[in-house]
Design a protein with these regions (language model features):
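Coil-to-beta-strand transition motifs
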Residues: 1, 75-77, 178-181, 192-196
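Residues forming anionic-ligand binding surfaces in small-molecule and nucleic-acid pockets
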Residues: 4-14, 112-151, 234-245
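Residue-level detector of conserved catalytic or cofactor/ligand-binding positions
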Residues: 245-253
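Phosphate-binding core of ATP-grasp and ATP-grasp-like enzymes
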Residues: 116-130, 167-180, 202-207
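A long amphipathic alpha-helix within ATP-dependent nucleotide-binding catalytic cores
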Residues: 146-182
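Conserved metal-phosphate-binding beta-hairpin within the catalytic cores
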Residues: 82, 181-202
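Conserved ATP-binding subdomain of kinase catalytic cores across diverse folds
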Residues: 1-112
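A translation/RNA-centric and nucleic-acid-associated enzymatic feature enriched
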Residues: 196-241
Length: 253
């Protein structure tokens, strides 16, 4: 399987018309780094990002740097979200009822606070243009048991535990480089032996919130090295030619 990361960007589950030069190559190289860094935690689908290892068609210059040769997997229909800091839709929910995705959190937290422990908040994996739905861990078990009656709970527990372990390892490393990983999303699949394997992209600005450690101050929103700028611009410019009336604007997960 060949996975190609394009220079396009999406927001609110819609692909925008503008492109960002070399975005696909940067995201591919970031995923490559993190896949190699975490291969001792969970196996992943990456085989190679070298053009010489690709089928002839993908050896073309336009695919150089932004393509990954991967093991083909049966993907699990759960997006594995982990939050180490309270922000975005999690902060909005906490202000309303003191919970994030049904998980009760300590009183007195302020926006961008670090959580006592990372929390796992899975969601459904919607089709493009539809919206993912936050679900409880037990609901994720139900979803997987419908597909894998004898293994659903085992798979749900594994992807939860892998998600937390991956986040802790990577967040600790990122801090040494001056970066806070506020939250991120992982996806998993099954190989031919029925083993859980990490797939898709990993810890890119498309799937994560990255904040600079320098200047981090709880109690307010943080500058970010991700596509939050795009989301903010879209919400601030409802009269732009992106036809935002057709896009359901809500806080990102």
């Amino acid at each position: 399987l060949i996975m190609v990361a394009t220079d396009r960007i999406s927001a609110f589950d819609h692909i925008l018309k503008n492109k960002i030069t070399d975005k696909g190559a940067i995201l591919t190289q970031m995923s490559k780094f993190w896949f190699e860094f975490t291969k001792d935690v969970v196996p992943n689908h990456m085989i190679s990002v070298d053009a010489k290892d690709m089928p002839e068609f993908f050896g073309q210059d336009r695919f150089n740097g932004n393509s990954m040769l991967c093991k083909k997997l049966e993907m699990l229909p759960i997006e594995c979200i982990v939050r180490g800091y309270i922000t975005g839709s999690g902060w909005a929910s906490y202000q309303e009822n003191g919970t994030v995705c049904g998980i009760r959190l300590p009183e007195g937290l302020v926006e961008s606070d670090k959580l006592p422990e990372p929390i796992y908040t899975p969601s459904t994996k919607a089709d493009l243009g539809d919206h993912d739905e936050n679900i409880s861990f037990e609901k994720s078990v139900e979803v997987l048991e419908k597909i894998y009656p004898e293994k659903g709970r085992e798979y749900a527990e594994k992807i939860r535990d892998y998600t937390i372990a991956l986040y802790k390892k990577c967040a600790e490393y990122a801090l040494t480089k001056g970066i806070i990983i506020a939250d991120t999303k992982f996806e998993f699949g099954l190989n031919e032996q029925g083993e859980v394997v990490l797939a898709d992209e990993m810890l890119t600005p498309d799937s994560s919130r990255f904040w600079p450690l320098d200047g981090y101050k709880p109690g307010q929103g943080q500058p970010s090295f991700d596509k939050q700028y795009v989301r903010d611009w879209l919400k601030a410019n409802p009269d732009s030619d992106y036809k935002l009336s057709l896009i359901h604007i809500s806080e990102p997960t």
